Amino acid sequence: MQKATYYDNAAAALFGGYSSYPGSNGFGFDVPPQPPFQAATHLEGDYQRSACSLQSLGNAAPHAKSKELNGSCMRPGLAPEPLSAPPGSPPPSAAPTSATSNSSNGGGPSKSGPPKCGPGTNSTLTKQIFPWMKESRQTSKLKNNSPGTAEGCGGGGGGGGGGGSGGSGGGGGGGGGGDKSPPGSAASKRARTAYTSAQLVELEKEFHFNRYLCRPRRVEMANLLNLSERQIKIWFQNRRMKYKKDQKAKGLASSSGGPSPAGSPPQPMQSTAGFMNALHSMTPSYESPSPPAFGKAHQNAYALPSNYQPPLKGCGAPQKYPPTPAPEYEPHVLQANGGAYGTPTMQGSPVYVGGGGYADPLPPPAGPSLYGLNHLSHHPSGNLDYNGAPPMAPSQHHGPCEPHPTYTDLSSHHAPPPQGRIQEAPKLTHL
C-alpha cells in the first residue's frame, strides 16, 4: 500500500490539472473512454505509468524502483506522438490530451519488452492488440532488422532505436538498455558493432597481410563476412591506430631498456657510448684477412685516426684496474716514436691492437701475436692506417685522463697469445 499511496501523491502532484482523478489505483488521468486498456494493464499500469511520467517530466524521484525502470520506461515515456493511442482503445486520444498524457499512455503497453518498436508502433495502425506485450528483448531485436521498423523507431523520435541502442530523439534514452544492436539496424545513433570471432579472425588475417585495404578487396570481404563496407573500413582504421600505439609503446620500452626486438640493436648502445658496441665491431675484425678491414673496424669503434674523443671519454672507467706494470713501461712509451703506446721493444711503426694498446709488429711475443695478427707484419703499407704517432702527440696522451697505465696494463696483460682474445671479451664488457 505504500507504493500505491506514493504513486498517488506523485501522480496528484503531476496530473492534478488534468481530467478526473477518481481513486487510489492511479488510473483516470486521461479521457474517460478507455476502460478495456485500463482493465488489461491493471497490475503494471499504475507502476510503470507513474514511473514513466515522473521520469518524462524530469522529476527525478529518489525511489529505487523508479531508478530500476530507467532503461525500460524511459524510451516509451519520451515518445510523444506515435504512441498516442493504445491498440485496445476504440478511438485515438482526443486532441486536448497533452504530450504528458500521451507519454503516460505509452508507458502502459511496454510490459516486458519496453524498448520495442514493433510493427504497429505508428499511430495509424490500431490493430495487433497484444502480441508485442509478450515479446522479449531478443525477439524485438530480431524484428528491428527490417528497415520498416527501424524507420518507425527513428521517425517516432522516441529514442527507442534497435534493441537497446538509444535513438537521438529521446535525450536520456540513449544507451538505456545497453545492448548492442545488430549491424543492419538503421538507428539514428550508430550502435557499437559486435563482431563474431570468425569475422575477427578473417579481419586480423587480412590486416596481417595488408594494413590498407583496397576497395575491391573490401567489397569482397564485406560479402564474405556479412558486414558492410563501412564497418570493415572503420575496423581497419581502428586496427591501424592500435598497431601504431603498440609500436610506439614498444619503441619507448626498448629505448629505456635493452635492444628492441624489432628495432636496430646498436641504437641504445650508441646512445650510452658503452664499450659493447666497440666489442661487437672489434671481435670479427681480428680474423679479417686484410689490414684495411681492421683499420675500418677501429675507426668505427674508437675513431682513432681522425678523432680521439670516444676513448678519452671512456678511459675514466678503465683506470680502476691496478696499473701494476706502469712504471717500467712508461719510459719506453715516451721514448718510442713520439709517445705511442706499446711494449719496450717497440721500433718504428706501432700497430694498434684490440686491447687498446699499441704493439710493435716485429717481435713475435709482444706485438702481432697478441691477437694473432701475424698478417700485419707483412703489410708495412697498411700500418699507415694504424700508426698513431703523428696524430697522437704526447699532449693528447697527457690530456684529461691519463691513459698510459690502462693501455700498457691491457697490452701487458694479454701477453700469452691464445688466452689474450679469450680474456679480452669479459674485460671490455665490464669497462
Swiss-Prot record:
One CC-aspect GO term: nucleus
One biological process term in Gene Ontology: regulation of transcription by RNA polymerase II
Gene3D superfamilies noted in UniProt: Homeodomain-like
Positions with biased composition (Polar residues): 139-148
Protein keywords: Developmental protein, DNA-binding, Homeobox, Nucleus, Transcription, Transcription regulation
Transcription regulation found in the keyword field: yes
Region (Disordered): 63-125, 137-192, 246-273, 381-431
Ranges of biased composition (kind: Low complexity): 95-104, 111-120
DNA-binding span(s): 188-247
Subcellular location: Nucleus
Gly residues: bias regions: 151-179
Listed GO MF terms: DNA-binding transcription activator activity, RNA polymerase II-specific; DNA-binding transcription factor activity, RNA polymerase II-specific; RNA polymerase II cis-regulatory region sequence-specific DNA binding
Comp. bias (Pro residues): 83-94
Main location class: nucleus
Segments carrying motif Antp-type hexapeptide: 129-134
Domain of life, per lineage: Eukaryota
Keyword Transport: no
The protein's role, per its UniProt record: Sequence-specific transcription factor which is part of a developmental regulatory system that provides cells with specific positional identities on the anterior-posterior axis.
The family this protein is said to belong to: Belongs to the Antp homeobox family.
Protein name: Homeobox protein Hox-B3
Organism whose genome encodes this protein: Homo sapiens (Human)
Gene for this chain: HOXB3
